[in-house]
A protein has these predicted regions:
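GST-like domain detector, emphasizing the conserved glutathione-binding G-site
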Residues: 1-127
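GST-like fold's C-terminal all-alpha helical module
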Residues: 106-179
Length: 179
């Protein structure tokens, strides 16, 4: 019997980076253990350092192998679970492109609209720079929906890593009433 994967994360309510691989693993139906590190605990850095060479979460443990960073975790999972990315090559390439953009971009949106998926904030007016980033996210989503399998509800029809990576943004939009 193989040891299940272990995902080391912070609180999914506040840590969008922790939420991403957790969502992906759940949607894939993968058996995994979860280690929750309270990120505001005095010893959080020491707890994380036990698992993560980068000193950050998330980290996926597979035996002695440690994979940190949500996009790297997604790619590692794709080696075992082909449903991580769309089947069609063009859609798969687009999914990887927009996932990489999500991972590396949208810093103003992240800073101006902090992640808390349980909160509801009203009266927040995004700055012009954040509005540009919001518009870019919406354009990405529209393009993915036009490219993917229209038969499913997700960005490319079926749930993929792109959905897991963009889910916290969708939740931010809900939190702040962004239309």
């Amino acid at each position: 019997m193989t040891t299940p994967l272990t995902l080391v994360i912070g609180n999914k309510t506040y840590s969008s980076w922790s939420m991403r691989p957790w969502l992906l693993l759940k949607h894939l139906g993968v058996d995994f253990q979860e280690i929750h590190v309270p990120l505001h605990a005095p010893d959080a850095a020491a707890q994380i350092a036990r698992y993560s060479p980068s000193g950050r979460v998330p980290v996926l443990l597979d035996g002695d192998l440690r994979i940190w960073e949500s996009l790297a975790i997604s790619e590692y999972l794709a080696e075992r679970y082909p449903a991580v990315w769309p089947i069609a090559a063009e859609a798969r390439a687009l999914a990887r492109s927009v996932s990489s953009e999500m991972h590396a971009g949208f810093a103003t949106l992240r800073n101006e609209l902090p992640f808390n998926c349980r909160a509801r904030r009203s009266g927040v007016t995004p700055s012009p720079t954040t509005r540009i980033e919001i518009n870019r996210v919406v354009a990405i989503w529209e393009n993915c929906r036009a490219t993917g399998d229209a038969g499913g509800p997700w960005l490319f029809g079926g749930f993929t890593a792109a959905d897991a990576l963009f889910a916290p943004v969708a939740l931010r939009f809900h939190t702040y009433g962004i239309a």
